[in-house]
């Protein structure tokens, strides 16, 4: 996902959907901006090597947003997600599962891992 922004793909990727709390969209714009700025500073100041992408998914599925994070190692992905649990923004998350995490593989490697009929 970060490669869409011109960043080289990392070896590990985590993708998950999420839905904001019902009251999130009733907060003043300034408050939401403040909360999200603090949330971003919290995670990416400690994990600047982790690259993230956010996709709005309103009306396309059961989720409002889809997030993707990429890192060179699995522990960096786990670290940033765990670190982000301790922010005010977490008070405004209704659902943020399921998580899909895996290492980057080539299409050939992926095909070779598939069950044979």
What are these regions (language model features)?
Residues 1-45, 58, 72, 79, ...:
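Short S/T/G/P-rich N-terminal loop/turn motif that feeds into the first structured element of a domain
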Residues 12, 63, 95:
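Residues that flank catalytic or metal-binding motifs in active/ligand-binding sites
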Residues 45-47, 72-101:
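An amphipathic, aromatic/His-enriched active-site/gating alpha helix that lines ligand/cofactor pockets
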Residues 49-56:
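A short linear hydrophobic-aromatic micro-motif
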Residues 56-62:
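A short beta-turn/loop motif at secondary-structure boundaries
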Residues 104:
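Terminal substrate-recognition subdomain of acyl/acetyltransferases
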